[in-house]
Regions:
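Conserved small-residue motifs centered on glycine
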Residues: 35-36, 340, 344-464
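Helix-loop-helix "hinge/cap" segment bordering the ligand-binding cleft or interdomain interface
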Residues: 111, 136-207, 224-273, 328-337, ...
Length: 498
């Protein structure tokens, strides 16, 4: 930690200009920073920026947007070159905005500065070439920097382990074994309330059900695509998808799937009474707390990906990289100073300062290496996080470290992290993050609007039996995909995957 701070101070001292001072004796800002954050954050008074100024002697004038629509409009003005700031922070730049602003000369290529002025970030990018690829335009430039989160974040299979225990069942490891477990959940009164009120498996829509497709080797993204060994393909027309949908129809017919799954939402299925009997055997969600009271969290554990053909694979929904969090415009003088400034957020010390604040002020370390907040959780939520950190709100550049969060004293939080990590070794990003040309992006949007809603509707009909799965109906389904441009979609994406 000391070495990171010392290095940062040394670099900035070499680059530091004479400090300008306003007439009132107030420090004049060195750079103009602009970006988006939630209304609970005020960059002018946030202790993170104050502490960073003490460390780096860089002061900012802030233009903070707290309204998402207003920031979207402002980004359009920036793209046209109107009243440019020096730095965009928590910028939420889309791939298209990054591409277009870079092409217009609005954004500075940051890659030439990284090895010398951002060695910690550069080391991360060298260790993970896919991270570097994700922020690199086709011309080789990198006008934006990422947020890199080591924390697990995915739509997972949360199974009621208390029910498994009540019914003396083992964790299922295949689709067939899961079917047997769901039948036991339906028949065995596992919540012990004497009523047949159990919902063996709850979900929201075909989008969420598709995460079960891994049990048949399927892990397509929202474009229904995946890439293996540089070849882009779709699982939609495969025999595996037909087998998957046939299995789902079986679950539906046996009332093992939530009958409201195609029409409900979290607010409608959520159990708010802490004393109520829990009706859900398995929940497809990023967390059970979206459906059950926090007190019931301990009943659930993550079901590891089911085996298919002797292998386990699961879709990684988001991946570790969020692009477009930080950029410098052509107005920025001495960009190397801000590259050194932001590099600190990719160090251990900088990550903690951004995410949890300063040791001794916002949190403390125990002798055993665990940590806890100095204040109660209500104060943490209402004061510490919004006023002393970059946590929440817009996504900031930097790294969010898993190891530190695993040492939090709250066992509910660390237990949930441990559960979510169970599937990580099997997760795979279906497609790499790339930058599309404007022409290809437009065409893909057109094709997606034809393919995705229709495909989801047809698959849902297969599940519910509204459309029986026969050779004729399956041929019609695959023909419908082809007529809507699935092969063209694959061909466009293939140009960007090697």
């Amino acid at each position: 930690m000391r070495r990171a701070t010392a290095w940062l101070a040394a670099v900035l001292m070499l680059l530091m200009p004479l400090t300008a001072v306003a007439e009132e004796g107030q420090r004049a800002p060195d750079y103009l920073m602009e970006g988006y954050d939630e209304a609970t954050h005020d960059w002018e008074t946030n202790r993170f920026f104050q502490r960073m100024q003490e460390k780096t002697d860089i002061a900012f004038e802030f233009r903070e947007y707290t309204d998402a629509e207003a920031w979207a409009g402002r980004k359009k003005a920036i793209a046209s070159g109107e009243d440019l700031p020096d730095v965009l922070f928590k910028a939420q730049l889309t791939a298209a905005e990054t591409r277009d602003m870079a092409a217009a000369g609005i954004l500075t290529d940051l890659k030439p500065y990284l090895a010398e002025y951002a060695p910690d970030l550069w080391q991360l990018l060298q260790a993970h070439p896919d991270y570097l690829e994700a922020i690199t335009l086709p011309d080789g430039s990198s006008p934006v920097l990422p947020s890199i989160s080591e924390l697990p974040n995915n739509d997972l299979m949360w199974i009621n382990t208390a029910w498994l225990k009540n019914l003396h069942l083992e964790m299922p490891s295949t689709a067939d074994e899961l079917t047997e477990v769901l039948r036991a959940f339906r028949n065995g009164d596992p919540n012990r309330n004497g009523k047949a009120d159990e919902v063996p498996l709850t979900f929201i829509g075909m989008w969420e059900l598709r995460f079960l497709g891994h049990a048949f080797g399927l892990y397509d993204n929202d474009y229904y695509l995946h890439a293996e060994d540089g070849v882009v393909s779709s699982g939609l027309r495969t025999d595996e998808n037909r087998q998957f949908l046939t299995w789902l129809h079986q679950l539906w017919e046996e009332k093992l799937l939530d009958r409201q799954g195609f029409s409900t939402m979290d607010t409608l299925r959520q159990i708010t009474d802490a004393n109520a009997a829990i009706p859900y055997g398995m929940i497809l969600s990023n967390s059970p707390v979206t459906v059950v009271p926090s007190g019931a969290m301990s009943q659930y554990g993550v079901l590891a990906p089911l085996k298919w053909d002797g292998k386990q694979i699961y879709r990684d929904l988001l991946g570790p990289v969020t692009r477009g969090t930080f950029a410098l415009t052509k107005n920025c003088q001495k960009p190397e100073r801000l590259i050194a400034w932001v590099n600190f957020l990719y160090t251990h010390e900088g990550s903690l300062l951004a995410q949890v604040g300063q040791e001794g002020d916002e949190y403390f370390l125990n002798e055993d290496g665990t940590w806890d907040w100095m204040a109660d959780l209500e104060t943490v939520a209402n004061d510490v996080l919004p006023n002393s950190t970059l946590a929440d709100g817009g996504v900031a550049p930097g790294v969010i470290e898993l190891a530190f969060q695993q040492k939090y004293t709250d066992t509910t939080t660390t237990g949930m992290i441990a559960e979510m990590l169970k599937s990580r070794e099997f997760t795979r990003m279906p497609m790499p993050l790339v930058f599309l040309s404007a022409e290809d992006e437009k065409r893909i949007a057109e094709l997606q609007s034809r393919i995705a809603p229709w495909a989801e509707q047809q698959m849902a009909a297969f599940v519910t039996g509204d459309t029986p799965i026969t050779d004729e109906s399956w041929t019609a389904f695959t023909a419908g995909l082809e007529s809507r441009g699935l092969d063209e979609m694959i061909g466009i994406w293939q140009k960007y995957v090697h």
